[in-house]
Amino acid sequence: MTKKFLFLMAFLSISVMYCFGQVNPQAPLELDKNVRYGKLDNGLTYYIMHNEKPAKRADFYIVTNVGAIQETPAQDGLAHFLEHMCLNGSKNFPGKGIISYMESIGCKFGENINAGTGVEQTSYMLNNVPVIREGIIDSSLLVLNDYAAYVTNDPKEIDEERGVILEEKRTRDTYQWRMSVAVKKAIFKGSKYADCSIIGTEENLSTFKPQELQNFYKTWYRPDMQAIIVVGDIDVNAVEGKIKTLFSTLPKAQNPKPKDVITIPDNKEPIISIFTDKELNATQVTLYMKNQPMPKEYRALGVSFLNTLMQKLISGMLNERLDDISKIENAPFLGAGTQFGAICNTMDVFLAGVQAKDGEGVTAFKALLVELEKAKKFGFTQDEYDRAKTNILRSFESAKENAASRQNGQLVQPLVSHFTSSWPYTTPEYDYTTAKAYLDMVPLVAINQSLPQLFRDDNMVVTFNAPQKEGLVTPVEKDFVDAIAYAKSAEIKAPVATVSNEPLLDATALKGSAVKKTAPGKFGTTVWTLANGIEVIVKPTEYKKDQVIIKTVSNGGKSILPVELLPSIEKNIFQIYLQNAGISKFSSTQLNKMLTGKVASAVPYLSQLEQGVLANGSPKDLETIMQLIYLNYTAPRCDAKEFEVGFNQIKAVLPNMMKQPDFFYSVQLQRAMANGNARMPILDNELISKISIDNIKKALGISFADAVGTKVYITGNVNLDVLKPLVEKYIGSLPVKAKKAAMWIDQNLDLPKGIVDKTFDFEMQTAKTTVGLVYSGLIAKNIENDILMAAATNVLDQTYTKTIREDEGGTYGVSVQGVISGLPKEDFYLLLHFDTEFAKSKKLIEMAKQGLVDISTKGPNVEYVTKARENLIKAFPEKQIQNGYWAGIVYEYYSHNKDNYTNYIETVNKIVTPENIQKFIKQMIDQNNRLDVIMNPKAK
């Protein structure tokens, strides 16, 4: 037995010591009885489950338990290439027949028709298929059947797809990708995993023989390696019969090739990886401790549940400590965290990582190691353990409460894990009961006794990743070896318990304000008008039992703030403030501990024209949510030292981020769209000098000191009788001072007029051209135009997929985004965005522009319009089982007098026509406002 196996054995011994006779860790876990599970004679596995969230929809999956790690050298990248080819011709769906058929019933490529290739497995999915006719179920299963054994792999189609995949590789070849390659070589040193890239080399993608692809397909795509999963609003018995009839015809493999089981060698001394890159944005050091995975024969037993539970407890307590340290003044690191996980079939890891200021990576790593040694030496305190247990059990409870609202995709993933990795598929109700039983029985001493087996000296890997820039000294391997030795000999003090039972506020001191008027509202809402003038619109739902969403809204926003305050509330800076702010007299670390076991959050927001508080949580914690909303208005926390902790993070990484092509491009795009308006601050190195906590405090004071004119939207599982007194107490106590509500100001934040070219060169390691074409102008904001914009972007998606992706092989994809604003002006912008090779860029840019011109003069492809219309019709009922959708519908109606729900389907059927799409696109491009933001690689 290797040392790597000892951690599991420690858990097994704990199981026997503390759990025997109450819950039996060696007994099988109870599988979800609602899943129909079976296996055909040819070896194919199937899972079927009935679910009506959403109604008349189903997900169809085929999972092949093989990924890129089984490729031969000549097949490098072909597992992923094959995934593409499954959509490029099969026995019953020649050419693009699968995509064409699925789009004809309202599904969308990329969203509902997709696939994913991993190192260990490959999955193909048809999501949210409208199973409104029996024939659609039959056809969806036929698609899976073709994936399983009847993909054409036509050499002509293969050659056409090479360019698409090479462009996908170009798009993915970022600093993150290069860093992941270096990390894999260290973690998997001495094994095939170290060189498994999934996407393959450019040389092999360009030159492989089609027969190699066919060989991979015929070797691995076979019934004994495949599972069919169908979850949705279907008849389980009927679907099982269809699967047996259709898939039993797949031939059983003769002399099937077994999968190679690839192990990772043990290492006695630490493996150290040092990687630098000019485009890397931060210094990161990560410690990996390699462990043997839970043997498959144990995964179906209670011990696997206990194992996972103890890992959650340990990482939760460690992360609380590390988070607290990161928020102190002069912290040794900017951020840190730990987690457990599987990174391949034959290895699990415990990892602990830190983000440091440039040049301080070794110091940060030492601080991290000291915390691990502290846990190993002294264990955790009882108050830490109690908080961790409470939070974990609350997460299980929330999952139990929301079990009935799970949508198909949430139900599919545990079934995939069961097939590929033998992890059991249990119910949230069973998980909650089991977790509670274990948490009630496993004492803190059991956790602390297991830590020495976790924090060992062998099988360690350390990865250091940092920016490569002048003047920054890169550490060497010895620095990290010395850091490990330092932590082991350091003088470490035992942790001190920190407990606070202080309430958020004295609720008895609030005077409140009674509901003076109650009226039935639109969409099943109830409208309360409080004596202080605040209007509360409540939409009770039961879509998620353990969720309530609250939004307070009043006019003004950034538009009424002095221009000198705006840099300090730029969206990224404001987010940093929120992450570190806390509330009232409580720091963020204190607040987190005070909210142990509660699902409650509330944060202020400032948009261009509005301000308010966004809150969400559990109905059980509704009073806490209301208290947080109240405190955001009356006691925002603006502590200079706490803000500086977060601000230091952005100051540390921003100069490096400006060297990343994608980030730099986004800055230039935002700057060009802002058109030089000082009221549109863009995060860059210059902006940093204009930011202060005092200006944040002033902005919050102006925005939240007076709640006059505020509307409050509450959506979710609320009882009006329970909610009403809380609204009267907390919303009724918000400060209302002025007689008249503020109004937003039109600050003329308009995009540039005319044809504007912003082309620039940028130094990058992987040469590519990034294109953004922004069309803009005036257009009426109404439901008809919103629908036409959604349909038009869909039509353009299909158009560019055909012309630029498939015909030219010029890009992995063209992103099309269209937005219509109603305030302060009724206007729009349409953004076309893609990456490509510099040599192809001019041609593709002209093709993108001409695509719009052709539609405006000749009309769109009629089939594309039909598919776009069907997609809008299909998507409409799917949204209606989500609280977020109804929160938006109610807000638009009561704040902007826009009804985006009533007669929606009728309107779609009426207006989504080729003629209207043609007119709509013509209306947009005829205004002759186009901003071209194009980044080319700087010549080396």
PLM regions with names:
Residues M1-V23:
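Bacterial Sec-dependent N-terminal signal peptides
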Residues Y101, Y150-I158, T171, V442-A446, ...:
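Peptidyl-prolyl cis-trans isomerase
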